[in-house]
Every structure is written in structure tokens, then in C-alpha cells.
Regions:
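C-terminal nucleotide
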Residues: 32-48, 52-56, 69, 75-118, ...
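DPxDG-like acidic metal-binding loop motif
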Residues: 137-157, 161, 189
Length: 360
């Protein structure tokens, strides 16, 4: 049976371990005369606007959707290299060796191979430096973008971020029918901080330029806190089509908060941005009973007690990471007071988007 995207996990390991393996892999590739490519693709953090990137809202509600998001320096690495034989070998949380593309269980990779016309004699490995399923960081889309980028390079094509993002949307939404939005693919492909607008005519990416000082402040004051719970976006978003008046009103409010978030970021008012995240979270919790639960509410209250002035759960909900804002000393308090399973990760911005870091 073909796996759904929600059930696919990328091999998760410490990034340092993977990077230490690269010289040996390249040496082997050179010795046997094979061609190796490595792509690096960031995941993302959405400040405001999540949910309005769904076609059911963006293409049907006046004004469309808008998201303020930033790519972060947590990556999906994809290696692509030739094989001696004509088989296809995949390595992620499991191993696959097949004779044809159609036999591949990993639906994202299967469709990426079809899209790029690569049909045999290839090996693909995906490695993530964070858990890659149900974290609310858009990791499935980062996988799709990263695999496409590496495969296009494999066939000698350098493609634009827009081409990668559109291709990933076609695979995940149009071909596989995943009930997800379109922000993750664009955030992963473009990198940096952006206002991403969604409407019936397409997607528009508008970079938000940050000064060096503002980048440093954001990286000091914002943290990610792992909930130790995961839930696939598809599971949360697989609900009846948008037609409930209250839900549409809430999504309009979330879209308006995205406009306000951009103003606060550009002005450098990060404390007010943290407060806005709290307001966004309260609105988002009313979208579906699957967005939050008692454990998540308890953890969020604990984060506020420890000094956070606001935050929100990332992604569709149900688990993953909280994005939290507080003073410069908040992170150390979180590390000291939270249990080990609630890992605290500094926010570090990626400015490059999906890129090829090795080709030989």
C-alpha cells in the first residue's frame, strides 16, 4: 500500500553527524566515478496568517490570504547520486529499493521523480536535523522542495525558487490531494522573512528586509519549545470545506493580524509582536477542537508563568513547537525549568532558502 504524506518520516539525526559523513561520501563518489548532489532546504516559522493559505479560503474569500513567515536554520538535507545498476534506492526512516518509480512507497519522492523525468539508476537519501513529522514547521514541504531541487540539478537544470515552490504545491496539493496550504513550499524555497499573499491568481512573495540589529534581536528574544506531541497537518486540516461563518470570521481576523505583524516587525516592536502572537493563538484555538488540548494549554500557561509575554503553536495544531517571545533571559529560564522532553531551540533565521551545497 502506498504511504500517505502524513505517515512519511525523514531520517532524523544530529546534523553534525551527517556533515561529518559528507567527506567520506564524496570521496567514495569520486573514486567510483559517480555524480553526487546535496541540497539543503530550511523549514519555516509562521508568525501570523496560518490557515489563510488554504485554497478553500484564499481562492474563495475576498482579499485572499496572507502569511508572515520566516525560514529558519533547521534543515532537510537531500543527497542524490547515480547507481551502477538501474534500480532506485531510497533511504529515509526506512529503506526502499525498487525497479520502477511506480513501485516507490514514499509518495513525495515518487512524484518528484515523475516531475523531473528521472526514472532509474539513482539513490536518494533524506536527513533532517529536527523531527520531520508533525512539528508544525512545514517539514514535509521542505522535503518536497529539497528533493526537487536536487533532482533538477541532477538532470542539469538550475531552477528558480518560484519554480521549486510551484512544483512542490503541484505534487502535494494537486496530485496527492493533501488538504494543506501553500505557504510552506514558498517559505522553504525562498528563505528569509516574507509576506506571502495568496489569491485566485496565484502566490506573491514579498521579502521583508531586516537590519542586522533586528535579526540579532529576533534571534535573542524568540525561542521554539517542543511540545513532545506530534500530529500531521493533514489530520488536523481534513475537515469539511470552509462554510461555517464563525470559522471564516476567525480566519479573516488571523489575516488582519498578519498585516499588523508585518508593521510590528518593520518597526522593531518585538514585544508587541509577542502579544499579537498570543492573540493569534487565542483566535486559532477556536478554529477546531483538534488545534489544542489540555496538555498543550497547560504547557502554554507554564511558558507564560516563566516570563513569556506571548506565543503560539506552529502549524495546523495538535502538537509540534510553540513559538515564544520573551526577554533576552527567558531562554535560560525555559532550559532550566522545563523538563528535557520540552526541548528549547533558539530561533535562527535562514536567508538562503533551498540551495545546492554540493555538486560533483
Amino acid at each position: 500500500m502506498v504511504q500517505s504524506t502524513a505517515n512519511i518520516a525523514v531520517a532524523y539525526c544530529n546534523l553534525d553527524v551527517f556533515l561529518r559523513q559528507i567527506p567520506a561520501l564524496l570521496k567514495l563518489s569520486s573514486r567510483v566515478g559517480l555524480f553526487m548532489i546535496i541540497s539543503r532546504t530550511p523549514v519555516r516559522v509562521s508568525f501570523c496568517g496560518g490557515g489563510t493559505d488554504l485554497d478553500s479560503f484564499a481562492k474563495k474569500v475576498e482579499g485572499g490570504g496572507m502569511v508572515i513567515s520566516v525560514a529558519i536554520a533547521k534543515y532537510i538535507h537531500v543527497t542524490v547520486n547515480d547507481r551502477f545498476d538501474s534500480k532506485i534506492r531510497l533511504s529515509y526512516s526506512k529503506l526502499e529499493t525498487t525497479n520502477t518509480v511506480e513501485e516507490i512507497e514514499h509518495d513525495l519522492v515518487r512524484e518528484a521523480l515523475k516531475a523531473t523525468g528521472v526514472s532509474n539508476g539513482i539513490e536518494i537519501t533524506t536527513i533532517a536535523d529536527i523531527p520531520s513529522r508533525g512539528t508544525g514547521l512545514g517539514s514535509s514541504s521542505a522535503v518536497t522542495v529539497g528533493v526537487l531541487n536536487a533532482l533538477y540539478k541532477h538532470i542539469g537544470r538550475d531552477v528558480s525558487p518560484e519554480h521549486l515552490a510551484k512544483g512542490a504545491c503541484e505534487i502535494e496539493i494537486d496530485k496527492l490531494g493533501e488538504p494543506i496550504g501553500r505557504q510552506d513550499q514558498y517559505a522553504a524555497a525562498f528563505g528569509g522573512m516574507n509576506r506571502i499573499s495568496f489569491n485566485p491568481d496565484g502566490v506573491e512573495v514579498s521579502p521583508i528586509t531586516l537590519s542586522r540589529d533586528l535579526v540579532e534581536r529576533m534571534e535573542r528574544e524568540f525561542s521554539l519549545v517542543y511540545t513532545n506531541n506530534t500530529r500531521s497537518a493533514s489530520a488536523v486540516l481534513s475537515e469539511p470545506p470552509l462554510d461555517h461563518g464563525d470559522k471564516i470570521a476567525r480566519l479573516r481576523a488571523i489575516r488582519d493580524q498578519a498585516t499588523e505583524a508585518e508593521k510590528l516587525i518593520r518597526s522593531g516592536d518585538l514585544k508587541s509582536l509577542g502579544t499579537l502572537l498570543h492573540e493569534t493563538w487565542n483566535v486559532k484555538r477556536g478554529l477546531s477542537p483538534m488545534v489544542s488540548n489540555d496538555n498543550l494549554d497547560s504547557l502554554y500557561s507554564r511558558l507564560i508563568d516563566l516570563g513569556a509575554n506571548g506565543g503560539k503553536l506552529l502549524g495546523a495544531g495538535g502538537g509540534g513547537f510553540f513559538l515564544i517571545h520573551g526577554g533576552p533571559d527567558l531562554r535560560s529560564r525555559l532550559v532550566d525549568d522545563l523538563p528535557p522532553e520540552n526541548r528549547v531551540i533558539p530561533l535562527k533565521i535562514d536567508h538562503d532558502g533551498s540551495r545546492i551545497i554540493h555538486s560533483t
